[in-house]
Amino acid sequence: MRAGLAGIVLAAIVFLIPVHTVAQSAEKGNAKGKSLDGPGGVIAVNGVRDENLPPPPVGPTPHATDGKPNLSGIWLSGNYNFANMGGALPLQPWAQKVMEERQATQSRDDPEAKCLPAGVPRITPYPFKIVQSPEVIVMLFEGNVHSYRQFLLNRGHDKDLDPSWMGESIASWQGDTLVVDTVNFNDKTWLNGRGAPHTEKLHVVERYSRPDLGHLEAEITMEDPGAFTKPHTFKRTHVLSATWEIHEYVCNEFNVDVDRLVGK
């Protein structure tokens, strides 16, 4: 099992094509668009598709040999304002104060600006590749020196792991929806570019579905009794690219003067 997973990850890394680095700065920007409330109080993320991208392929949902929807492919997030996570987060007073203090310093201490892992769900503005098998699903992200997440299917959480940047993810299929359950985070990441904090009690549930060939829909629920007053759910839609490859992104190479980051 471990050897198989290593092979999947290694294969995904070995065949990267070093063409060019893509700037992903939308998270701190103000993308234009209309904010829409989704069904049942779920809020859709404000965003506008990049008109320079070709339209996604058209066709029915592909299926794997085990009959489950095949989520494999390279997925792009379009030109989204990823600081917007479906409206204001339900932060407790102390967490709201921390976020405001970070904004006042123009996010000078953002861990991602220091080439540290973005965490979940913040990592998703970057293009990512899904490699799917019946036992494990791997997401390889273009950003942050190729962070990856692995979802082991049909097993429980490991109670003996130390908290980590990306947490520990397990997954299961509920009909045609892949449900990813992630816990055991450290408290070092920001939830968004505006500096929203969380604690080690953060629990993230992602529900992925592929309604057709060209789209991957994600419904994300975050709960953190240490920092939130209630759970928060929002949606994102990713589009399949038939031409994109995961490009080399060496954050540390260009981030050579961290002590002089713009900020206050």
List each model region and its residues.
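Bacterial N-terminal signal peptides that target proteins for export
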Residues: 1-9
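PEST-like low-complexity, intrinsically disordered acidic/proline/serine-rich tracts
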Residues: 5, 13, 17-264
